[in-house]
A protein has these predicted regions:
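Single conserved hydrophobic/aromatic residue that forms the stacking wall/gate
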Residues: 1-7, 12
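Ordered, amphipathic secondary-structure segments that act as subunit-interaction surfaces
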Residues: 13-51
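Hydrophobic/aromatic beta-strand patches that form the interior of the parallel beta-sheet core
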Residues: 16, 41, 84, 101-103, ...
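S-adenosyl-L-methionine/SAH cofactor-binding core of RNA-modifying enzymes
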Residues: 50-126
């Protein structure tokens, strides 16, 4: 059976991921690409347990990009998503405003995911914390910059699990699942 390649029908353009510890970023990239994210952006936040130097992150980029390429091929995607260089929190706040909608997964509250307005969104930026979540001041700053805080219910999900649930919800709500 011949499969056609899937283009960029997914509307989650960017996934801003606070830097997790160890090799979790590799799994995060792989699964996000399989689900249709176009770009993964590591971000250094206050509660990141892992605090790599920019040069260390730059050195890992080719390997992370290979993981993205492999996941794209496995998923039959027509494009290879980008793994961007690590950004500071301030850089991520400024950059995420380019999306039609920015969604902050926040364990500290917000609207239920099914209440978030996704109508007429051609691009969504998904913002995800590390193992320690977001500092309340960072969450406030993200919201002041236009992010809508959403929560996934009463369970506290791991930093590598919560975004997969969120991406799946967005895919379903936008007709891509």
């Amino acid at each position: 059976m011949q499969r056609s390649l899937v283009g960029s029908e997914m509307c989650i353009r960017d996934r801003y991921q606070a830097v997790p510890k160890a090799d979790k970023l590799e799994q995060i990239i792989q699964k996000s690409v399989e689900l249709g994210v176009t770009r993964i952006v590591p971000v250094l936040t206050r509660r990141c347990i892992s605090r790599p130097k920019p040069a260390e992150c730059q050195k890992k980029l080719p390997r992370l990009q290979k993981i993205a390429a492999s996941a794209a091929k496995q998923a039959g995607r027509g494009i290879i998503p980008e793994v961007a260089p690590m950004l500071t929190f301030a850089q991520a706040c400024a950059e995420m405003q380019q999306a039609d909608r920015a969604i902050l997964l926040y364990e500290g509250g917000g609207v239920r995911f099914d209440e978030a307005d996704l109508h007429d969104c051609r691009s969504i930026a998904l913002i995800v914390g590390s193992e320690g979540g977001f500092d309340p001041e960072e969450a406030e700053q993200l919201q002041q910059n236009g992010a809508v805080a959403v929560w996934l219910g009463h369970r506290i999900l791991r930093c590598e699990t919560a975004p997969l649930a969120a991406i799946s919800i967005v895919m379903h709500r936008t007709g891509n699942l």
